[in-house]
Amino acid sequence: MNPNKALWEKGAFTEIAAFMHQSGEELVKSLGIKPPLRVLDLGCGDGTTAIPLARLGAEVVGIDIAQNLVDAGNKRATEAGLNRLTFQEGDACNLQGVNNHSFDMTISVFGAMFAPKPFDVAREMVRVTKPGGRIVMGNWIPNDPTSFVSQLLKISAAFTPPPPEGFISPMTWGVESHIIERFGQAGVPKEKISMVKDTYSFISNNK
């Protein structure tokens, strides 16, 4: 089995994602979504971003490597009555079965950043997005003193073994030079790439 798939299927990510729904909703509101729009949510989890996209009228396909998260996403979509939203299993590094230029927008919020081959991820995101379409990523920023996640990882690193040789930290997706290099190799000119720093809050005690 793909070790990345095994890792994500082992955890209880749906419980963690419940505290992150606000981030997906706030990001989606900022994108000016107007139907008809076909969107791919890559590394979608159980629908943190895909569900608010579909509620705004977009046709959304969510792809995640973990089958349990795909099942949870389809369950949430059915319960919400969102018949233009589907979830399916897939690998962000190799989107087999997804045709070139299939989507008006490809989005990934705290998802594809965890795939082990970032240059392949960038290439695939560009490949499946229509010319003139948009690619949107939400990624954590390393060494940010205001970031809960950054500080949590810094603390945990002191108590865990070093990563294996060749490991590429997902936090590198929060570094401007890496983003430009990865999408540049996928054919996106530097002047077409822009970055915005923002802060989203975890929901605590339903507040």
Which functions belong to the PLM regions below?
Residues 1-37, 48, 52, 72, ...:
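Conserved class I S-adenosyl-L-methionine
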Residues 115-116, 129-131:
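Helix-to-beta-strand junctions that scaffold the AdoMet/dcAdoMet cofactor pocket
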Residues 93-105:
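A short acidic, Gly/Pro-enriched loop at the edge of an enzyme's catalytic core
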Residues 38-42, 46-95, 120:
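Class I SAM-dependent methyltransferase SAM/SAH-binding core
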Residues 119, 126, 134-204:
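Conserved catalytic/acceptor-binding region of the Class I
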Residues 104-118, 141:
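A short SAM/SAH-binding and catalytic strip from SAM-dependent methyltransferases
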Residues 38, 133-134:
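Short glycine-centered segments of the SAM/dcSAM-binding site in methyltransferase folds
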